[in-house]
């Protein structure tokens, strides 16, 4: 058995703008989660071409310990809380696979994302067979809804309900911002359709861990896209060449940060 959910995140930006904004925000967010022996190590970041698909391939290692729940830490052997993330970014389609060498075939997280120029109204954009699609829970994430944010995660300067972009004049996003966006021909719109498939085969813990991971994915998607929108003035003028240069610099920074300082960012204890 696997647990599948589709998260839909609507944003007041275009699919083209989001490509730069996403990569900028991933680099920044990675630095916020790295330090004290934990965090993200980038092994590869290079172009790929396979079976007619072209894009950017990344291979990252996540060194975790405080970022997993206590009931997993208690039974996990030393060194087992290391996860490999391989991603194929053939934008506007992206596929990410997370694995763990200790659990091998008994664990994976697969995140498949389509970025579409709409307001999250398309059904089954990932083309699942009808029987599988019937089992998928659809979760709508509203980046301006503070009630969807964990209290420990809230930051006023990353709140789309308060933020207004100087460069684009977008925001602040009120309670009816999606309806207003639908009726505003001057503002672009898009939706990230993120299909998350989780397998965790460990007797007695399977449903508990699968539900924990899905909850964490929703938390990550919510916080990340709130940041992305509130950082728009920092990335809206960047080119893909700027992004690749920034990624190279971030890779070196992460290696230094991970080896020193204290643990930073999201911890499972906050959940």
From Swiss-Prot:
PTM comment, free text: Constitutive phosphorylation of Ser-262 has no effect on phospholipid transfer activity but is required for Golgi targeting.
Gene Ontology CC, one term: cytoplasm
The keyword Zinc-finger appears for this protein: no
Gene Ontology terms describing biological process: retrograde vesicle-mediated transport, Golgi to endoplasmic reticulum
Modification N6-acetyllysine, positions: 215
Transmembrane segments: none
Compartments where found: Golgi apparatus; Golgi apparatus membrane; Endoplasmic reticulum membrane
The reaction(s) this protein catalyses: a 1,2-diacyl-sn-glycero-3-phosphocholine(in) = a 1,2-diacyl-sn-glycero-3-phosphocholine(out); a 1,2-diacyl-sn-glycero-3-phospho-(1D-myo-inositol)(in) = a 1,2-diacyl-sn-glycero-3-phospho-(1D-myo-inositol)(out); an N-(acyl)-sphingosylphosphocholine(in) = an N-(acyl)-sphingosylphosphocholine(out)
Keywords linked to the UniProt accession: Acetylation, Endoplasmic reticulum, Golgi apparatus, Lipid transport, Lipid-binding, Membrane, Phosphoprotein, Transport
Highest taxon in the source lineage: Eukaryota
UniProt-listed InterPro entries: PI_transfer, PI_transfer_N, START-like_dom_sf
Single GO MF descriptor: sphingomyelin transfer activity
Modified residues (Phosphoserine): 262
Stored PANTHER family: PHOSPHATIDYLINOSITOL TRANSFER PROTEIN, PHOSPHATIDYLINOSITOL TRANSFER PROTEIN BETA ISOFORM
UniProt family annotation: Belongs to the PtdIns transfer protein family. PI transfer class I subfamily.
Function: Catalyzes the transfer of phosphatidylinositol, phosphatidylcholine and sphingomyelin between membranes. Required for COPI-mediated retrograde transport from the Golgi to the endoplasmic reticulum; phosphatidylinositol and phosphatidylcholine transfer activity is essential for this function.
Name assigned to this protein: Phosphatidylinositol transfer protein beta isoform
Species classification: Eukaryota, Metazoa, Chordata, Craniata, Vertebrata
């Amino acid at each position: 058995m696997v647990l599948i959910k589709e998260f839909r995140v609507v944003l007041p930006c275009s699919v083209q703008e989001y490509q730069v904004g996403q990569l900028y925000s991933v680099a920044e967010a990675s630095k916020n989660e790295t330090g004290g022996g934990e965090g993200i190590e980038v092994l590869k970041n290079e172009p790929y071409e396979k079976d007619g698909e072209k894009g950017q391939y990344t291979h990252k290692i996540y060194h975790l310990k405080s970022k997993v729940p206590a009931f997993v830490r208690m039974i996990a052997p030393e060194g087992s809380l290391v996860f490999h993330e391989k991603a194929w970014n053939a934008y506007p389609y992206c596929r990410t696979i997370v694995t763990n060498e200790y659990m091998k075939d008994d664990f994976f997280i697969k995140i498949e994302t389509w970025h579409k120029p709409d307001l999250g109204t398309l059904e089954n954009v990932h083309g699942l067979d009808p029987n599988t699609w019937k089992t998928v829970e659809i979760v709508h994430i509203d980046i301006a809804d503070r009630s969807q944010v964990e209290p420990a995660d809230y930051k006023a300067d990353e709140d789309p309900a308060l933020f207004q972009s100087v460069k684009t004049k977008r925001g602040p996003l009120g309670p009816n911002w999606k309806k207003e966006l639908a009726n505003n021909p001057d503002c672009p719109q898009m939706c990230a359709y993120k299909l998350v498939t989780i397998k965790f085969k460990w007797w007695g813990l399977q449903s508990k861990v699968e539900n924990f991971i899905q909850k964490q994915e929703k938390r990550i998607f919510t916080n990340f896209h709130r940041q992305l929108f509130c950082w728009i003035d920092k990335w809206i003028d960047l080119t893909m060449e700027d992004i690749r240069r920034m990624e190279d610099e971030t890779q070196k920074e992460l290696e230094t940060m991970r080896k020193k300082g204290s643990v930073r960012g999201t911890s499972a204890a906050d959940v």
